[in-house]
Amino acid sequence: MLRSGYAPSGDQPEAIRRLVEGLNDGELHQTLLGVTGSGKTFTIANVIAQVQRPTLILAHNKTLAAQLYGEMKEFFPENSVEYFVSYYDYYQPEAYVPASDTYIEKDSSLNEHIEQMRLSATKALIERHDTVIVATVSSIYGLGEPASYFEMVLHLVRGDMIDQRTLVRRLAELQYTRNEAELRRGSYRVRGDVIDIYPAESEKEALRVELFDDEIERLSLFDPLTGEVISRIARYTVYPKTHYVTPREKLLEAVEEIKVELKDRLEHLRSQHKLVEAQRLEQRTLFDVEIILEVGYCSGIENYSRFLSGRAPGEPPPTLFDYLPDDALIVIDESHVTVPQIGAMYRGDRSRKETLVEYGFRLPSALDNRPLKFEEFEARAPQRIYVSATPGPYERAHSGAVVEQVVRPTGLVDPEVEVRPASTQVDDLLSEIRFRVQGGERVLVTTLTKRMAEDLTEYLMEHDVAVRYLHSDVDTVERVEIIRDLRLGKFDVLVGINLLREGLDIPEVSLVAILDADKEGFLRSAVSLIQTIGRAARNLHGKAILYADKVTQSMQQAIDETERRRAKQIAYNERHGLTPRGITKSVTDILEVSIPGGSAGSRKQAARVAEPGAGYKVAKPSEAARLIKQLEEKMYAHARDLEFEEAARLRDEIQRIRESALMA
């Protein structure tokens, strides 16, 4: 059920109708060409609501995914809206550098909160049809075999017969750990015939199983922090702690297959007189096998995933796509970036692993622990809609028809584009900036090199212009703060090299200046120019100036496309008597990244209890993970001592740090 205070307008109704019609007609590829500010997300939400199908939305980075997740939560408050991104705060893959004989061990920091959300996403696909999952390209990486995962679930029904020892053994098979001191996600505790389980995919609720004479007498959901019972239930399904669970008999079969491959590989290495590599491989593999037999898993178990899932050599790994129902829909947002990203993942992963195999760090089967190849993604992905203001060649070649959404509901038209000589670009820019600043408007300037951006910033400062320089070293949170300051008028001009990234749609920006627009290359391609020109599309007086001594083919394409859209928008406004109106979003509204785990659309206070928060400033995600772990230990300690106010304060502080870290 779609909830919104707006009705589709402008090009939206026709775009929705055509996309829904295409889906119902079985079209595999469709493209929505939607200009900046035309309400592409709202259109997609309406399509999802009309076709009533499980949907996977792919974004090209975590920040964009978090924004889409927040918007979808607002549009579908009663649906199961989930978030599936990489659960690593920090990840250093295993690698070997032969030139210096350096082995780099795998090092990572897992974000438990995101891991919980990933498990929640696959659970939703199994249990509900009204699921919308927002994911990044990490969804093409290997995940546990769905058949094994489903086989391992534990169904608990009130009145069923099960003894305490059997229940505890089943939880251990699901990789839950026993913890009598504190109940944490993915753990359980036993107190006589009462067993408390904190499901790995649950955000806030734990399960209490009360047995009487080997019968499940009562099932209850309760708050793991306070112990308060929330509700009594008749049945509950406990899902494995991780996607990488395997039944014992399959595990034993896999171990035998690993030993067979090891024997063959050792013979091969010794025949080539690679004795050091052979010894290394034998030692490492037999150690892993021993650990697997003892506890059911080992560090780096994903390298043996081919055997655990029973696949043939070279066969693609199971991924999130294997969990999708047959009638699912895929929406690829910012497809001009996301589609090439999908294709690039496999190649980088392959070259690193081939070195590990060659030098005896891994068995050849480790090569099958990989992301999907692009052709495998194509074969697995169901019907899909590509969404972009500038669709790439792949989308255009595969889509039967491109559905255009050029007219904005606000009546705003694309900015006027002007070409001026590059020889006088700096002085001309200075006079344009002064004119815009007098009107209380802001300016974006994009240069080709870091050196030029720094020099220009220095020059503008010398001429009393309030200017800031946005460079690649600025992290996501700081970047958001810089944009906030620009919107608030703390400075008037933002200089950068690549200002295409999402989040730079700022209504106060009335001028975009592109220096050296005639220098062909990635930053001055037709797609890049159209995207950059679009940054001024949310202002009534929007204008783009391209400084160039000649008009290149890319420039001409960008100018022609902008003029085509502008003409269509003006004609629509005249036909319907529509007066363009500027966007008046508050600074908080447009900058807010709705973080998964919080309530959509509302910025949580850092602390909701009487005590002021400590105001921890987190520089890196890896630091955030360590700090969250420390604070969680303190929180549980306070809860055990019945100091619930202090525990609640720490819980809110953890939530604030988690929000900051997720934006990184």
Curated annotation (Swiss-Prot):
Residues 21-410 form the Helicase ATP-binding domain. It comes from the Bacteria. It is found in: Cytoplasm. GO terms for biological process: nucleotide-excision repair; SOS response. Residues 625-660 form the UVR domain. GO terms for molecular function: ATP binding; ATP hydrolysis activity; DNA binding; excinuclease ABC activity. InterPro entries: Helicase/UvrB_N, Helicase_ATP-bd, Helicase_C-like, P-loop_NTPase, UVR_dom, UVR_dom_sf, UvrB, UvrB_inter. The UvrABC repair system catalyzes the recognition and processing of DNA lesions. A damage recognition complex composed of 2 UvrA and 2 UvrB subunits scans DNA for abnormalities. Upon binding of the UvrA(2)B(2) complex to a putative damaged site, the DNA wraps around one UvrB monomer. DNA wrap is dependent on ATP binding by UvrB and probably causes local melting of the DNA helix, facilitating insertion of UvrB beta-hairpin between the DNA strands. Then UvrB probes one DNA strand for the presence of a lesion. Belongs to the UvrB family. HAMAP family: UvrB. Forms a heterotetramer with UvrA during the search for lesions. Interacts with UvrC in an incision complex. The beta-hairpin motif is involved in DNA binding. This is UvrABC system protein B. It comes from Methylococcus capsulatus (strain ATCC 33009 / NCIMB 11132 / Bath). The gene is uvrB.
